[in-house]
Amino acid sequence: MSAPALVALAPGGRDPEAVATITALVAEVRALRPDLRVEVAFLERARPSFDTVVDRLARAGHDEVVVVPLLLTNEGSASGDVLSAVRAAGERHPGLRISASEVLGVSPSFLGVLDERLRDALRVHRVRELDALVLAGEGSGDALANQTVARLARMWGARHHLPVTAAYATTAPPATGEAVRAFRGEGRRHIAVGSLFLAPGALTSRATELALEAGAVAISEPLGAHPEVARGVLARYAVGAVELVPV
């Protein structure tokens, strides 16, 4: 019996750099598990679409599919869109057992990725000293989703023995610029921002712009196509594949 196919499903967007980053991440997943059928798909405004990928898998004879939503927080509307798309695909292909795993989420193992990305940014800007950190995430109207980012921020600060604030690009305060200004108001001058985003995009650009305007000395690139993130995708897939096994 072959393993279920894995579909890594991203929200989508018009930014070609974001699409390229997600595609590269899924290539990392394939490299770690060459025995699996692994596909990338987008919900909207980018190709291949989720429907196209599911139809292709069904035609190829796959009868089980695990969808891993490439979302860092379990934000209500985005997660709802994924579940609606999965249900519709199951109705379109009655012989196909298809389910969605938990969202990729944020794992403590991603702290190493954050460190790596930030070191790269500090090297580019020739920054040798830091006295505060800001962890910038997407933000949500869901307080629990925001608490997940804040929890990771506390872990990141403890790792480096530096004060840290979680900031958000949408909805929830503080914005990255506000967080940087608050630290500067305390007399801190060497403040770096870690980007807790999966790929580039409008929110990432806005968070970066606000942080630089407020005086941040460096802003890291998003997590992107990193083997540790790919392992996170496979961990979600593994749980989803087990749940497909009849009991």
Give residue ranges: language-model regions.
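Active-site-proximal alpha-helix that buttresses catalytic centers in soluble enzyme cores
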Residues: 1-247
